[in-house]
């Protein structure tokens, strides 16, 4: 499909973004990411040995030609996130950043106040900011207004695999957004990814559902196809939902 997605200064053919955690080893991770067709993969800066060019996490992604999206996972407030972002830019040579601030280690819920504060400052510093946030239409609009290149509202809590629990709010976010909407977190099955795309999301980010699968490489293929299918359905107009039956082949004229 010739259906390109532009975020910031990059254009993507694939609308499936990926994570790098929880894979059994670097080789499986690389093969799965390649099979997924993903062109953007996120990783926590805390997992990268920035002074080691042969880093076991970094090298497979670079060798596969996939764009890096460092994230600030582990940051508990705006100050820590800004510091991590500056380190990532210096070490990895990219101004792209997935902004994550979740002070509660149990539920990993993003802190909306600290996220907005950090986003505003990071945009001023020249970062291309993609903030992970609650599926809050007001917050997403504020993040857009301070200059974020996209918003990344959650479908469900990180790693929960519950799917698109926040559907009603995602629909509002998608409707009013003037920047790309990437549904992030909670996507546990290819059908969840397809649904997000059918709703009009511009992309999805998937990690656990691929990495923790019995066969991550095959699951990556399943997600690739699901995202393509959901996007194609959205682009071509899903049939309207009705509250009563509508015959597909009415016999009225025939019987008359």
Curated annotation (Swiss-Prot):
Q: How does it assemble?
A: Homotetramer. Forms heterodimers with either ThiH or ThiS.
Q: Which UniProt keywords apply?
A: Cytoplasm, Schiff base, Thiamine biosynthesis, Transferase
Listed name of the protein: Thiazole synthase
Q: Where in the cell is it found?
A: Cytoplasm
Query: According to the UniProt entry, where is the signal peptide?
Result: none
The pathway is: Cofactor biosynthesis; thiamine diphosphate biosynthesis
Residues of the active site are 98 (schiff-base intermediate with dxp)
Asked whether the keyword Transferase is assigned, the reply is: yes
Name the reaction it catalyses.
[ThiS sulfur-carrier protein]-C-terminal-Gly-aminoethanethioate + 2-iminoacetate + 1-deoxy-D-xylulose 5-phosphate = [ThiS sulfur-carrier protein]-C-terminal Gly-Gly + 2-[(2R,5Z)-2-carboxy-4-methylthiazol-5(2H)-ylidene]ethyl phosphate + 2 H2O + H(+)
What Gene3D superfamilies does the database record attribute to this sequence? Answer: Aldolase class I
Q: Which family does it belong to?
A: Belongs to the ThiG family.
Q: One Pfam family of this protein, by short name?
A: ThiG
Q: Name one GO cellular component term.
A: cytoplasm
Top-level taxon of the source organism: Bacteria
Which InterPro entries does the record associate with it? Answer: Aldolase_TIM, Thiazole_synthase_ThiG, ThiG
Is Cytoplasm there in the keyword field?
yes
Gene Ontology molecular-function annotations? thiazole synthase activity
Biological role stated in the UniProt entry = Catalyzes the rearrangement of 1-deoxy-D-xylulose 5-phosphate (DXP) to produce the thiazole phosphate moiety of thiamine. Sulfur is provided by the thiocarboxylate moiety of the carrier protein ThiS. In vitro, sulfur can be provided by H(2)S.
Annotated binding of 1-deoxy-D-xylulose 5-phosphate, by residue: 159, 185-186, 207-208
* Primary enzyme class: transferase
Q: Quote the EC number.
A: 2.8.1.10
Q: Name one GO biological process term.
A: thiamine diphosphate biosynthetic process
């Amino acid at each position: 499909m010739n259906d390109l997605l532009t975020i910031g200064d990059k254009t993507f053919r694939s609308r499936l973004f990926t994570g790098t955690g929880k894979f059994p080893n670097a080789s499986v991770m690389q093969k799965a990411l390649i099979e997924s067709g993903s062109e953007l993969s996120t990783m926590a800066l805390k997992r990268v040995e920035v002074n080691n060019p042969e880093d076991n996490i970094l090298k497979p992604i670079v060798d596969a030609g996939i764009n890096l999206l460092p994230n600030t996972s582990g940051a508990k407030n705006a100050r820590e996130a800004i510091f991590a972002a500056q380190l990532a830019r210096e070490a990895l040579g990219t101004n792209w950043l997935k902004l994550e601030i979740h002070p509660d280690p149990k539920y990993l819920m993003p802190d909306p106040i600290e996220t907005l504060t950090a986003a505003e400052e990071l945009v001023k510093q020249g970062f291309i900011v993609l903030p992970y946030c609650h599926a809050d239409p007001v917050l997403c609009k504020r993040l857009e207004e301070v200059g974020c290149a996209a918003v990344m509202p959650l479908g469900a809590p990180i790693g929960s695999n519950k799917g698109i629990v926040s559907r009603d709010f995602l629909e509002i976010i998608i409707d009013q957004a003037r920047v790309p909407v990437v549904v992030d977190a909670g996507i546990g099955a290819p059908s969840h990814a397809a649904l997000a795309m059918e709703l009009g999301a511009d992309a999805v980010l998937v990690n656990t559902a691929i990495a923790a699968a019995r066969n991550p490489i095959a699951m990556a293929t399943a997600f690739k196809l699901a995202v393509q299918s959901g996007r194609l359905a959205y682009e071509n107009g899903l049939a309207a939902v009705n509250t009563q039956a509508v015959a597909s082949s009415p016999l009225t004229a025939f019987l008359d």
